[in-house]
Amino acid sequence: MRSKQVLLLITLILLSPCAWAQQVPPVTGAEGVVVDVRTGEPIAFAQVVFVGSQIGTMVDAEGRFQVENRQGLVTLSVGFVGYKKRIVTLHANRITKNMRIELEPDVYNLSEVVVTASRHRDRYSRKNNPAVDLVNEVIAHKEQQRPQHDTSQLTYEKTILALDRFDFDFERNALLEKFSFLQKYVDTAQFNQTPVLTVSLRETLSEGDQELARQSTGLDNLLEKEGLSANLDAMFTRIDIFDNTIDLMLNRFVSPLSSTLAVSYYHFYIEDTVAIDGERCVKLMFVPVNRESFGFTGHLYITVDRHVLKRYSISVPPQINMNFVSDLSLDETFSVAQGGCLQSKEMHTYARFYIFKNWRQLYAHHGVFALDGGSGEEASGVSLLDDLRPVPLTAKETVIDSLVTELRRVPEFNAAIKAVEIVGSGYIATASDRERSLFDIGPIYNMVSLNPVEGVRLRLGGMTTANLSSHWFTQGYLAFGTRDLRLKYSATAIYSFRPKEYHPYESLRHALYLSTSYDLENPGQNTDLLDRDNILMSRWPSLPPTAMQYARRVGLRYEHEWQNRLSVDAWVQYADFEPAGALAYHRIGADGSLTAVSRFADWQAGLQLRYAPGEPLYNNRLGQESPFNLSKDAPVFRLRHTLGRTDYRFTYHRTDIIAEKRFWLSSFGHIDTRLHTGVVWNRAPLPSLFTPQSNLSLYLSPNTFTLMRPMEFVADQWVALHATYYLKGWILNRIPLVNKLKLREVVSFSGIYGSLSPKNNPRFGHEGLYALADGTTLFSTTPYIEVGFGIENILRCIRIDYVRRLTYTSGLGKRDLGGIRIGFRLTI
């Protein structure tokens, strides 16, 4: 399945009547231990599954297990390699505790290999193990087997989303009665043969990397303009089992065929021989050494004669630290292509998602099929899909549009859609149906905020939509501070050379922007994710004011974005600045005297090149940096050059180079990094120099310094590094009891080193330069460094860090040396 930073999952579940008026079914389950009947020793990694379903678990290293369901299932199947499978019947509608399930050893011959029940974790040996030898044989030749990329291969992909176990009694529940029409749309899930309500269908036909046709129907189309497609594609990617690391559901898993980790990360067991497409294959079972690690359980089917991977079937252990995913399994079958390499015949991914475990879940099935023959030139669009679709649509899949039409007639459904649109986009449509809204009000997150200069800041704004014009747009706002009593404003006219579906920031962008504004800002503050006046970036008005300034701007900007993820920005701008808060400017005279500067002007012309190879297109109004954008693995490079003239006397050139990259450490988490270096080439006064981005609010904002005051440092040459390591629970998952909280560790580092050359150093008394402002200092030979240690995934979305400043600490109070910061991050 694919999804919109789980926002789609929340939407689909909330939109279903089960989220409003569901009577939670009783629980049937069991807790206990699985042991060897002869020795009484626990059997680690045994599988405990409810018969007729995918609901189950893997027992831990001590043989303990806990499993439950709300679907009325009462029969458990318990098994492990080398043991006879045992069927156990439970008492319905209760949890059976302290169970002791004894498995009887089994002995059977497989070719020349004898498999017995002595496969406990403490007895497992990699030496003289035929299963390990067989895996090593496949790994050694995997480059010869790996499927090759074929630019002419036609591939069909199909994704369905459905509300799982949709078996409500509509007649007996008054709240559900108005949704009784849903019964005629109920289908059967291929995953577990349960009743489901299919709410989304997506089909794609590709030739190599070129997409030939795409078709989608269902509820998610109502949210398409907020970036849904990119997130759907990010969650469901085509995996390669031969890679060392598998990218799945926005996480990284160690492959059972990893050249570096497979044998040490997994235990392998030969289980049986089976026939697949007429070939005898060894059925090889594998389980992770540590059940909390990001790995798989499952089977590899390897041909007996050629030791070629014929098929694999893998699933994710329920103990790992993943959010919102209750079941996840994959199955892929291969054929041998010309040249001896493998070719994928078809691959299936099945998943079930949840918001709250006691609610109905979201079922997803993603299928990828290799097509024989045909050509993308024979037809186009939907007709091409109809001609080449390998599996016919079910009767219920063909009427999803009718389902949506009927749902739109229910007021409660429309209200839920409206609420999700507001949360996802930050804007409120001025019509009941966004397809008729000419103007949207927002962003809602900026309507009220706090800061020491303005006090309570009130803001109201919005933008026109493509329903008014698909090329011409306007946006703006008015803001007012209860303390400074100044009216601020912003107005932008946009012409898009490409027609837009709803708003001007949809990819690909090609537009002109003419803007004017007057507002309060922090020098050096240019946060990536949030505006300065976002409610989360507020500072309590009673705190001492920091360095701020009023800025009046008029500018013209041109933006062009290409499919290869190269974009260019060019702009000219006039700005007039007035110091505010704790900021004051003083100009140095010929005799060394200081003259107060109440305001100054700055002209700029600039050009920026941005390149992000592999970055998916994203259509949210916040752009690629939106917190709702799930896919941020692609590297981003920016080269920016600015020509400016400040105070009508200083002409300067400034160059910035910025690189951002996410480094995955296989299943051990990832490190997000950002490197920013630059130089001001000419003499320039203080306001035109570089000052690091600071953020003194309680909220964690990426790529900012949380304990540095605005304009605390200035430089004309600098290099800054931000790095955050998300460990994904690698440590906490191994601590008993703590691991049940699903907490995850975070370690962060922010550092910067810079210098101010003599030509721009006011201490040398150069006429016309500005003296250093109060509280502003220069870098010594020591870089500025702050580090943070935190816990995330609290309640699935909250992050709490303790941040500590390590350098330039002289004279600072305890509060300025460190503190608690809070962030929000919703991940799978």
Identify what each model region corresponds to:
Residues 23-25, 99-117:
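Conserved "repeat-terminator" motif of extracellular CCP/Sushi domains
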Residues 27-43:
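Structural motif
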Residues 40-44, 66-73:
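Short Pro-Gly-centered beta-turn/loop motif in secreted/extracellular proteins
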Residues 46-50, 76, 115, 153, ...:
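Hydrophobic beta-strand segments
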Residues 50-51, 77-89:
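A short, solvent-exposed loop/turn motif at the edges and junctions
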Residues 54-64:
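Short, acidic Ser/Thr/Gly-rich low-complexity loop/linker segments typical of extracellular
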Residues 119-281, 287-295, 356-442, 446-449, ...:
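Structured extracytoplasmic
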Residues 250-255, 381-828:
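Exposed, low-structure sequence patches enriched in small/polar residues
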